[in-house]
Amino acid sequence: MLTHQAFIQSPGDTFLNLGFLTIRWYGLLISLSVLIGIFISKKLAKSRNINPQYISDILPSLIISSIIGARFYYVIFEWKQYSGNNFFTSFNLFDNVIQIPSFLAIWEGGIAIHGGLIGGFLSILFFCKSKNIHLKTFMDILIPSIILGQSIGRWGNFFNNEAFGIPTELPWKLFIPLQNRPIEFINYQFFHPTFIYESLWNFLIFILLISIFYKQNTNSSLRPGFISCLYLIGYSFGRFWIEGLRIDPLCLGGLPPFCDGGLRMAQFISIVLFSSGLIGIFFLRLKTYNKKTRKNG
């Protein structure tokens, strides 16, 4: 097996193993995303005269709701993976091996970002109502950190040898170990590193959103909510294209790797979110136009 020919290859999913405690890359990257997100969001909140403490206040519920939503969404469409003989899995707790329901083992991978976005939005909506905060302004503050977190978190797929694309021999090909390949592609060694594509795309969106965020201070046409709508458009556009390369899609009415006879859920949701973003920008621009018309009239 000529694994050295691969441009990239995962070193494994474990960052540190202390025997009684194992730290995995996936969890480490999520933690890093949260810390960076707190720093950026608090800085953006100050620029909008929003109390930065609100970022810390919403954090626990935002994290919990996002993780639950992401996991719940994934498990629904992959229930066969967690049912029957696979219902329980082993968990090392301070050097004691116990059995827990496998759908709780989120550190082993298996989350869907669209589910996380739904859970996170519900948390933000409830928080803004309880604190009487302008929802669109608060969303615009949080969105740049969210897309950056998505960019960083995608590398968890790399360490877990998951969420890769169709076979390829391109120079940046990714080697996938035999045990991580779907049976349909067991004889292929190298695959599209779709996590890199999405990570880079999301980072570019982050740069774009940050630059527009600060332009809102001087451009009245960029109303609150514009950042959020642009995020829906940009992220969904990239995700739709990248999802078409993946061989592990969540399917509705079909089976992986290509959801024959069915739909790729991520692509369907991307179309919905993309359209929602366009409609949102249309109404924001219409509101700006009407405001200028009344002012000039």
From Swiss-Prot:
The family database entries (PROSITE patterns) matched by this protein are listed as: LGT (PS01311)
Q: What domain of life does the UniProt record list for this protein's source?
A: Bacteria
Give UniProt keywords alphabetically.
Cell inner membrane, Cell membrane, Membrane, Transferase, Transmembrane, Transmembrane helix
Q: State the name under which the record lists this protein.
A: Phosphatidylglycerol--prolipoprotein diacylglyceryl transferase
Q: Name one GO biological process term.
A: lipoprotein biosynthetic process
Name its pathway. Protein modification; lipoprotein biosynthesis (diacylglyceryl transfer)
Residues annotated as transmembrane:
20-40, 58-78, 106-126, 133-153, 194-214, 225-245, 266-286
